[in-house]
Amino acid sequence: MKFTIVLFTLISVTVAAAATTTTTAAANRIQNKAYAYYYCNSYCTQAVNDENSCGYYDTDVSNQEYYACLCTKSSYYNNLRSCDCFTKVVYYYSTSICSRANVGTYVGGRTSTTWGVSATKYRSSTSTSSLTRKSSSIGASPSIAIASSTKESSSTESSSSLEQSSSAGQSSSTEQSPSTEVSSSSSIEESSSNQDISSTDSITTISSDSSTGNTDSPTQGGGGNSGNNGSNGDGGNDASGGGGVVNENEQASSPPSSQSSTNSNQPNSSQTAPGAANYLSSVSVGTLMILVLGLI
């Protein structure tokens, strides 16, 4: 139990000592820089933040790097001007900040004699400003790169539009295809006319074959008009009949499919062929009778 109490006491003393050290360091900083002011409002707090951003400093009051950093910060002086520290009897003592241009001691008030001091009077401030210019030039270069990449993207879009125009040209060449269709249709008409001519020839062959009694033509259904019995076949006069008996046991060899195709192409063939066959058969019978009478 005693050990716990002693340990707790040691921890408390250590924390208090650390806090005291931090407070002492802050107080020493204000004292070493030869100025003291109280935090009145947010503007004063922002001014202190500007001081802290300039970095840690040593006990030498004539530290030019730290002073040059404060002299180049316009926000630092603007915050001090906007602060109410002057009206609350807060004195801003400074024998170092920007005092290189105006030797003397500045006592707080509404007028300022050292705020607009040029920072170029300090060696370190000149190097700081040059670093600022370099950083601005580095920041500008990425924007140029972005702009150039944007231009490249726009050129890519124009190339894509050219590809679309070329595809449109191909479609225009495709429009010439109807002329090909016209030529093909004309060739079809010519071939159909040739079919009509060939069908006419088939009519002639049918009439000549029927006069001799041949029944092997593929376009005529039945012959047998001048068979051995001397009488017309029952199916010979009708093209759709499929053919009659020609010589006792002999039948037509043409298939029904060829007969139907002939009838579709030649609707008048069933009337022309039987008429010619009857006419020729009557002439042949008359000739035979004259020969028989002449022999008698």
UniProtKB/Swiss-Prot annotation:
The keyword Membrane applies. Probable GPI-anchored cell wall protein that may be involved in cell wall organization, hyphal growth, as well as in virulence. Belongs to the IHD1 family. Its main location: secreted. GO terms for cellular component: extracellular region; side of membrane. Residues 220-245 have a biased composition (Gly residues). It is a lipid-anchor; GPI-anchor. Induction: Up-regulated upon milbemycin A3 oxim derivative (A3Ox) treatment. Residues 276-296 form a propeptide. The GPI-anchor is attached to the protein in the endoplasmic reticulum and serves to target the protein to the cell surface. There, the glucosamine-inositol phospholipid moiety is cleaved off and the GPI-modified mannoprotein is covalently attached via its lipidless GPI glycan remnant to the 1,6-beta-glucan of the outer cell wall layer. This is Probable cell wall protein PGA41. Residues 146-212, 247-274 have a biased composition (Low complexity). It comes from the Eukaryota. Keywords: Cell wall, Glycoprotein, GPI-anchor, Lipoprotein, Membrane, Secreted, Signal, Virulence. Glycans are attached at residues 229, 268. It is found in: Secreted, Cell wall; Membrane. Residues 146-276 are annotated as: Disordered. Residues 1-18 form the signal peptide. The lineage of its organism: Eukaryota, Fungi, Dikarya, Ascomycota, Saccharomycotina. A lipid is attached at residue 275 (GPI-anchor amidated glycine). It comes from Candida albicans (strain SC5314 / ATCC MYA-2876).
